[in-house]
Curated annotation (Swiss-Prot):
Protein name: S-adenosylmethionine synthase
The protein's assembly and partners: Homotetramer; dimer of dimers.
Reactions the enzyme catalyzes: L-methionine + ATP + H2O = S-adenosyl-L-methionine + phosphate + diphosphate
Binding locations of Mg(2+): 18
Family in the record: Belongs to the AdoMet synthase family.
Positions of region (Flexible loop): 100-110
Annotated binding of ATP, by residue: 16, 164-166, 230-231, 239, 245-246, 262, 266
Lineage, uppermost ranks: Bacteria, Pseudomonadati, Campylobacterota, Epsilonproteobacteria, Campylobacterales
Source organism of this protein record: Wolinella succinogenes (strain ATCC 29543 / DSM 1740 / CCUG 13145 / JCM 31913 / LMG 7466 / NCTC 11488 / FDC 602W)
Amino acid sequence: MRKEFLFTSESVTEGHPDKMADQISDAILDYIIERDPKARVACETLLSNGFCVIAGELKTTTYAPMQEIAREVIREIGYTDALYGFDYRSAGILNGVGEQSPDINQGVDREDGEIGAGDQGLMFGYACRETETLMPLPIFLSHKITEGLAKARKDGTLPFLRPDGKSQVTVRYVDGKPVGIDTIVVSTQHAPDVSQERLRDAVIEEIVYKVLPKEYLGDDIRFFVNPTGKFVIGGPQGDAGLTGRKIIVDSYGGSCPHGGGAFSGKDPSKVDRSGAYAARYVAKNLVASGVCDKATIQIAYAIGVVEPVSILVDTHGTGKVEDDQLETCVRQLFRLTPKGIIESLDLLRPIYKKTASYGHFGRELPEFSWEKTDKAELIKNYFNLK
């Protein structure tokens, strides 16, 4: 590893078009799974200038008023006026959802009570000691800024902000550890009558300096706030939005590999989602146990097959025991079949809309069961660690 380097991650606000799509897809999933926990859901959303298309496949016994759900999500985000680029009242919403293919379903719902993986695929989980939530610092800080943008807009602190926005944080590392922030980029949609100077000062003073840890705020940070100038046209009026296009924002900000599968709109029989949650659960518990300082987990599945086809543990040279021993431990202490993951993490709950903005990982909310470190003591005992 290089002695000194810079690493960058980004986040987007809940009003970013891609995140709007994720939230609509997950709100529909929540509505269905609350009423039919055995439902199979694959819900995709497209947003563009003045309209929204909902597509995908379902197998369920319940009815979901998808247009009403979508309008409520758009309203909650803050698109309540056409001047903002989208209006929940007037947007055209098309429902094109169909029935799940029986060819897929036959491999998932098995007669023996097990659940086969809903598709093939590989998922990654990651944890490190850079933050209290065992997340990489650049993505952690980026999310703090975008959350701050939304809060300042909604509580009236900065009433000239609009829903669409992004952040990006570059962190300086020495000997593999973060030592400070090098660059912060914030782009935020705003009212047409606010000056760029006022906007820049307000974002830095009212958001960045208030939400980021003081130990990382030096006088030499480079700030770029709306570096191209005005950002009045935003939301789906400025860019189309699509479910599953912010998978790096959703995960670890590029600090570890990604298997390529998106999360939102998918019920937990889809291992793209549940497998990634399980991989984070494993990685976080390994680091929390003290057996390593950093862990990358890969899990892979075959469609219709119960057991994972492979499990990999990589502690990047920080482990107190060999990685192959950790793999054996993981296989013994964690249930990594689709059914085992669903049951151990209690995933048949309407918890998913909360995951669809500001990251699926590193947020220790009661609903986010994959953030628990309840296996840490078992791992310590397994290796007789003090």
